[in-house]
Design a protein with these regions (language model features):
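Bacterial N-terminal signal peptides that target proteins for export
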Residues: 1-8
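Bacterial N-terminal signal peptides
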Residues: 8-16
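Non-catalytic cap/lid and distal C-terminal segments of serine-dependent acyl enzymes
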Residues: 20-280
Length: 280
């Protein structure tokens, strides 16, 4: 019986190992910011076993006050398991408190250039990703939700799909919050900069026939709920295809832990429809 018990325990251990991928920390160089930026890359467990297989990638952006460890260590601790189940690489960069802009008033912040160009090039060079916007998506929560749509809408040649969870999709009602005035200047003195750095105004630039696949989610008790509703209504008026979900919930990690599951499935369907989940 003891031998059988040991064999059973060993089998369970092997199953547990097989069910999870691995997480690699990298330092991605940024010429724009003259520094290296940390990122965590979450790989499926099949990554090392099949050297001929390439994978689609989802970029996950953290919120204000977070860093590159926030997604896998706090918001979605089983991200490595999902990477294995779905056959997807997740990339979690450190976005500081940048709102993922190239900040006009803070020249050392060029996170739009970093994430949309430098980081993607680094990941594609060093990992077996499918190197196509049809195999690349970006999303995030709060500040990262703003970043997901900001970068996804503005860089459709890089990201074929984008999303937001509880995103600050219109920053203008919050002129004194989250260090935005450090990047944009005071709203009262720089209204045109604030107007040109908010996601809701980027919607006017979208060609409905070329719009990225887009998914937006916000809880009804979230302080960003009204601006997300406004963005949804504007996208409807502009006939821009998107998926919009709202349900009971507040601005908290428990909400995003659940919301990201739906967004991952949305992106997975996008990848499959684009025939990208295959070998290059």
């Amino acid at each position: 019986m003891k031998i059988l018990a040991k064999i059973f325990a060993a089998a369970l251990a092997l199953l547990a190992v097989a069910a999870y991928g691995k997480t690699v920390e990298v330092q991605a160089p940024s010429e724009a910011m003259k520094k290296e930026v940390s990122a965590l890359v979450v790989l499926p467990d099949s990554y090392d076993a099949d050297s001929g297989k390439s994978y689609p990638a989802i970029y996950l952006l953290h919120g204000f006050g977070g860093n590159h460890t926030t997604w896998p260590k706090r918001t979605k601790p089983n991200l490595d398991e999902i990477a294995t189940q779905q056959g997807i690489i997740f990339v979690c960069p450190d976005g500081a408190k940048s709102w993922y802009w190239d900040a006009p008033k803070k020249p050392e912040y060029k996170y739009e250039t970093f994430v949309s160009k430098e980081l993607v090039e680094f990941i594609d060079k060093n990992f077996r990703t499918v190197k196509s916007p049809k195999a690349r998506a970006i999303t995030g929560f709060s500040m990262g939700g703003h970043g997901g749509l900001w970068l996804g809408i503005r860089h459709g040649d890089v990201f074929g799909a984008c999303g937001s969870m509880s995103g600050g999709v219109d920053i203008r009602p919050f002129p004194s919050s989250w260090a935005m005035k450090e990047s944009l200047g005071a709203k009262s003195e720089n209204p045109e900069i604030w107007d040109s750095h908010t996601v809701i105004n980027e919607a006017d630039k979208i060609d409905p026939s070329k719009a990225p696949a887009m998914i937006i989610d916000c809880g009804t008790k979230d302080f960003f709920y009204k601006v997300n509703q406004a963005l949804h209504e504007k996208l409807l008026r502009l006939n821009i295809p998107h998926e919009y979900t709202t349900r009971p919930g507040a601005h908290m990690h428990e909400y995003w832990n659940n919301a990201v599951d739906f967004q991952i499935l949305f992106f997975k369907k996008f990848f499959e429809a684009s025939n990208t989940n295959n070998k290059e």
